[in-house]
Amino acid sequence: GKAFDDGAFTGIREINLSYNKETAIGDFQVVYDLNGSPYVGQNHKSFITGFTPVKISLDFPSEYIMEVSGYTGNVSGYVVVRSLTFKTNKKTYGPYGVTSGTPFNLPIENGLIVGFKGSIGYWLDYFSMYLSL
């Protein structure tokens, strides 16, 4: 896949992703907060099409992500992120994608998610997050 690194900002306002209900997560793009203003992050797109888009609009700054969870698994010989769920202090968004394979969950006990990095080829290969304490 093609690696991406959005860097760190001051918060998250919106997450735009796409998924296929038979394969995995495709595109991934975030609207961050940068010192009180929206900052539109780069759209990290799959090499292929056929995905359903989803827009997760957070009620920033009172709503923030407390946990990211999902599944990784094998699609066409690649281990990829098959499903994502975002739990905020107000509600749960998802799951989006295929909830089978190896589950993971990343609860944030202290701090805020302020950025994402990862890799996308046909699907989201992996991702990690920047935290601000």
Swiss-Prot record:
GO molecular function, one term: carbohydrate binding
Positions of disulphide bridges: none
SMART domains: Jacalin
Stretches forming Sequence repeats: 7-64, 76-130
Positions of glycan attachment: N43, N74
Residues covered by region (IgA-binding): 68-89
Record-annotated Jacalin-type lectin domain positions: 1-133
InterPro entries (alphabetical): Jacalin-like_lectin_dom (IPR001229), Jacalin-like_lectin_dom_plant (IPR033734), Jacalin-like_lectin_dom_sf (IPR036404)
Protein's UniProt keywords contain Glycoprotein: yes
Keywords: Glycoprotein, IgA-binding protein, Lectin, Repeat
Pfam families for the chain: Jacalin
Top-rank taxon: Eukaryota
Purpose: D-galactose-specific lectin, binds the T-antigen structure Gal-beta1,3-GalNAc (Thomsen-Friedenreich-antigen-specific lectin). Potent and selective stimulant of distinct T- and B-cell functions. Shows a unique ability to specifically recognize IgA-1 from human serum.
Family assignment from sequence similarity: Belongs to the jacalin lectin family.
Summary of subunit composition and partner proteins: Tetramer of four alpha chains associated with two or four beta chains.
Name of the protein this chain belongs to: Agglutinin alpha chain
Native species: Artocarpus integer (Jack fruit)
